[in-house]
Structure formats: C-alpha cells, structure tokens
Amino acid sequence: MPMDVRGCLFPSVQMLLCWLVSLLLATVGGKEVCYGHLGCFSNDKPWAGMIQRPSKIFPWSPEDIDTRFLLYTNENPNNYQIISATDPATINASNFQLDRKTRFIIHGFIDKGEEGWLLDMCKKMFQVEKVNCICVDWKRGSRTEYTQASYNTRVVGAEIAFLVQVLSTEMGYSPENVHLIGHSLGSHVAGEAGRRLEGHVGRITGLDPAEPCFQGLPEEVRLDPSDAMFVDVIHTDSAPIIPYLGFGMSQKVGHLDFFPNGGKEMPGCQKNILSTIVDINGIWEGTRNFAACNHLRSYKYYASSILNPDGFLGYPCSSYEKFQHNDCFPCPEQGCPKMGHYADQFEGKTATVEQTFFLNTGDSGNFTRWRYKVSVTLSGAKKLSGYILVALYGCNGNSKQYEVFKGSLQPEARYIRDIDVDVNVGEIQKVKFLWNNKVINLFRPTMGASQITVQRGKDGKEFNFCSSNTVHEDVLQSLYPC
C-alpha cells in the first residue's frame, strides 16, 4: 500500500509553496461532516488548511473505517471477543472484568488489529497482571493513502472515547483505569480519544508517534500531555522524514519522552539497499520491516519491557551526546524512570512535561541493558599500546567482556568508560581484566589492573576491586573486593 504524504507538507521543505496554499485555503469557508453519536468533524483549521496539512478533506465515516474492538483477557488469551459500544450487551456477555485495568493497543498506518505484535503484547501482560487487553482494529481506515489515514485517526479516536464513556456511564468503570497504547498514527488516535475524554484517561503511551501531518501542529490535533493524567512517549525514528525517512516525531509530546539510542537509529536497523532506494510514496506493507525498522522498534521495546522491568532505565539528560559522554550518570537522587510498561511507577512522572530521558538498548532479540561506569587503574613496568577489557561477575550471572579503552596504556593511569551490560548481574562479586595489543612481542610484557571501580547506574552504588598482580596479554586477571 503506498504511503502518499503529499497532503502533509513540512516547514523545512517547500515552505513558499505551503504558505501560498495555506493562504489560499484560508479564504475558503470551513465545513464539517457529522457522524451520529460521534459528533461532527471540521475540515477547517487546525485540522486542515495548515502548512503541515493543507488538504481540506474529511475523515471517513465510521462505517467505512469499521473500527473493531478485539477483547483478550487472561481467560481468553488466544481468541478475541468482539465488543461494541453501541451494543453494551456484547460487553456484558464478554470476559471484560470491571475490577481490572483496561489497556487498549492501537496500531498505525497499513497495520491491523489482528497483527501478531498486538496479541504478543497482550500475552506478555497476562504473564504479569490481570487485565482487559483490547486490540483496536481500524485496518480499513489505515490501509489507504497516508494523508487520508492520518485524517481518519479522528474518527477512530472518537470511537474509543465513546466506548470508554459507555463503560463509565453504563457500568461505572472509571476512565482512570484506562491505558491507551498507540503506535505511529495510533498514538494520535489515543490523543484524540484522550482529548474527547477531557484528559481523564489514566495513561497514554505513544510508541513513536507519527510525524507527517502532526508535528508542529496545535495540541488538539496531535498527542500531547493534556490528553491523559500521564503521557509517556518512546521515540525511535525521529530523524527528519526528508531526507532520512524518519517517520516518528522528534517533538516532545509527553510528560516523559524517552529517546533510546538517541531516538534516530536503532541497533540492528542499519541502512540497507532497500531502505535507501525506496521512495516515500512507495512503501508497501511487505517491506515495512526493512524500510521502517526504526519505527517498529518502539513497540518491540515496550513489549520487551513488560517481562524485563529493570532493563530499560532512562537517564535524564539534555542531549544524547552528553549521555554518551558520561555527563548524565548515575541516576539522580529521585531515581530514573523505566521506559515502557512500568514508566508510571516513576514518582516524578507528572512533575512537569517534556522530561527527556536517554538510554541504550541491544539489537535484535535481547534489547535490555544495564548501565555501569567502569574505572580501571593500570599497573605494570612500562607504557604499552593496546586495549583493555573488563567482565562483571555477580550473584545473578556474568557479563561478556566490554572494551574500556583502546590506545596508549600507561601504568598508574586511570581509564573510565560507561558500559551497557546485556545481563543483570546483580550485586557484583568480582571482575576480570584482560589486555592485548595484537603485536608479537618477544619480551612478553605484563600489565594488570591494580584497582577497578564499578559504579551502578540505577542508584550510584560503587563496587571496588583490587589486585597486586600483572598478567601477560590475553590472560585473564581476577580482581576481588578490596
């Protein structure tokens, strides 16, 4: 299905054309279309006739979009039950439980509610909680040109809001127990639902909210912090759509905004031939895993966080560059939030809006990482060139070897680096040191670590290890608590 964003223009390109179009459209009187219990939808500003979305079109009707609510619960984890706000009897006859939290999962462009990742997310939730998990299917409204799909989000959001209202008025179910999780365009669907419910929804999670037709627009058009009591956002594809094909927003739109790996290029999503030659108007469903890898990482990170609550700690920092240069370590006294499912456990989650956090993840498969600062003081007879590596050994497991430094190795000098460990080793009991210079040396020099200090990111706790030994290259040296 082509992704045609010609109706969604960007301030950074074709500014003059956009301004002229916007000026022309401003002279045209706004109109609206009404869809029964969902109310009326205007095609005037700010919904249309703006620089970012000059096309004055309407969202499709509810009948054309055909939004469906697919309910999964702990009692029916494999087969959904369809519930309808216009027929409350379907809710009463289902496994929907009033004493549980309800989490809606909302797909984005060219996706569908029966896609595997939505059910996978539900099933992970069932492993840790009793929950009503509703997959929102609006594929008939999402599998069209992108511009039309972006306008259709308003009707889907209205449908969700109406269902939540029915649950509240007919069954006494509080909107505070509702969590809306939206990917891409689904993030803005969630925002529209939250806006219609006047921000009384308990939580909205935006998974790489879509940029085209939304970034830079007024709050009522896009996801923003006022749409729920708590809004958290994961940005994974925030590079500009022109020329980098970044589909996600770089704009901060939540109380907590997480930028894993800097928010632009995710590990395991390196550029390939297909993603470099594909045109913005020619992305079809069969190639989305190639061309939109970064964009899809957001829901994969969230799903992984459900069963790995401690492996996605976000560090407050003003930029990814400062984060990478060790300027934002360890977590402050009030702690760091957990990106993903457990972000709402952070005590300062709504202290202010647009709080910014950075972290690193793994590539495909094991995304979780635990951050440490490692300080190595060397010992030896003379200066050498090469690299040094350290492995952590704890009560929960052992890490692989991580490079701390490469270059000139000076005895008595100290080398410091932050590392992102792929295993939660727990309380560190010992460390192992190794050095190598990849050069044949007949004198077989030795070097060692006299002291290694490891500081844990989550709480700043330090572990100190010492040794008086030196070792030949490629020979492991064990250090124990001083």
From Swiss-Prot:
Keyword Chaperone assigned: no
Pfam families from the UniProt entry: Lipase, PLAT
Enzyme Commission identifier(s): 3.1.1.26, 3.1.1.3
Disulphides: C34-C40, C122-C133, C269-C293, C317-C328, C331-C336, C466-C482
Phylogenetic lineage: Eukaryota, Metazoa, Chordata, Craniata, Vertebrata
Organism expressing this protein natively: Mus musculus
Region (Required for galactolipase activity): 106-118, 270-292
Expressed in which tissues: Expressed in acinar cells of pancreas (at protein level).
Cross-referenced PROSITE patterns: LIPASE_SER, PLAT
Induction or repression: Up-regulated in CD8-positive T cells by IL4/interleukin-4.
Pathway: Glycerolipid metabolism; triacylglycerol degradation; Glycolipid metabolism
Protein name as catalogued: Pancreatic lipase-related protein 2
InterPro entries membership: AB_hydrolase_fold (IPR029058), Lipase (IPR013818), Lipase_LIPH (IPR016272), Lipase_N (IPR033906), Lipase_panc (IPR002331), PLAT/LH2_dom (IPR001024), PLAT/LH2_dom_sf (IPR036392), TAG_lipase (IPR000734)
Topology class, membrane: Peripheral membrane protein
